[in-house]
Amino acid sequence: MNRQALVCRNILEKPDITQREMAKNMDISLGTVNGLVKECLAEGYIAEEENGKEKYLILLEKGKELLKPYKVDGALIIAAGFGSRFVPLTFETPKGLLEVFGERMIERQIKQLHEVGIHDITIAVGYLKEKFEYLIDKYDVKLLYNPEYSCKNTLATVYRARKFLKGRNVYILSSDNWMRENMYHSYECGAWYSAAHEEGETKEWCLTFNKKGRISDVNVGGKDAWFMYGP
C-alpha cells in the first residue's frame, strides 16, 4: 500500500482535510501521518499554503501524477449464486436484488460507484440472470453469464471475467452487500480485502497478517481477530 499516495488521495478528496482526519481515514497514528506529510512535501507531491491564520495542504501536479497508476478502471459485481442463506426470499428474486430500506442492494452499490466516477461495471450473473437485464438500460452496465453457477463457486465466476480484469485496477464486489457510507474511491493505492474486528470467539473466516499488513493466511474461527466482512 503506497501511503504517500494515500495522503495525496485524502487531499484530493477533501482539500480542507486536517492531519487528524487523515489519521482516522488511514487508521494510523497522527505522528505517522505527520511524517508522511513531511515526506510528501519534500517530494513535491503536495504544498502547504496559508489562508489567514490557517494552514492547509494542496495537491500539486506531481502528486496527481503519483495517483495516476492507482486509478480504478471499473468494477466486477458477483451476482451469479443462488443465495441459499436467503431462502425463501431468493426463490424468485436473486439476493442482490433484495431490498434494504427500500433500495435494492446491487443498485445502491452501482450508485455509490458512480458517485466516485466508476462507470465501467460488469455484473457476473447466473441464477435468474434475466432479472438483472433491466440494469443494462438503467445504469449502462454489462452482464457476463456464468453457465456453471450451480456447480462451481465464486472463483469460477471470477475466472469467467478474467479478460475484464486483466491488467486493470478493478473492484471485485458481491451483489448482496449494503453499505451505509460509500467506501469506494476513484483511486486505490494498493490491493485490500474488506474486514471487521471481532472481540472474543468467532466462527467467521479470520485473517492473519504479516508485518507489512498483508494477509498471509485465512482460517475458519478465531479469537479477537479480523474477519472477512463486506465487499
What positions do the PLM features span?
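Short amphipathic alpha-helical interface segments
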Residues: 1-17, 24-25
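Short, cationic-aromatic polyanion-contact patches
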Residues: 1-3, 18, 51-69
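Key DNA-contact positions within bacterial/archaeal DNA-binding proteins
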Residues: 31
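A short, conserved structural fragment
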Residues: 41-51
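N-terminal glycine-rich phosphate-binding loop and ensuing alpha1 helix
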Residues: 62-129
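Conserved beta-loop-beta/alpha segment of the NTase-like Rossmann-fold superfamily
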Residues: 130-211
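Catalytic-core segments of class I nucleotidyltransferases/pyrophosphorylases
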Residues: 212-231
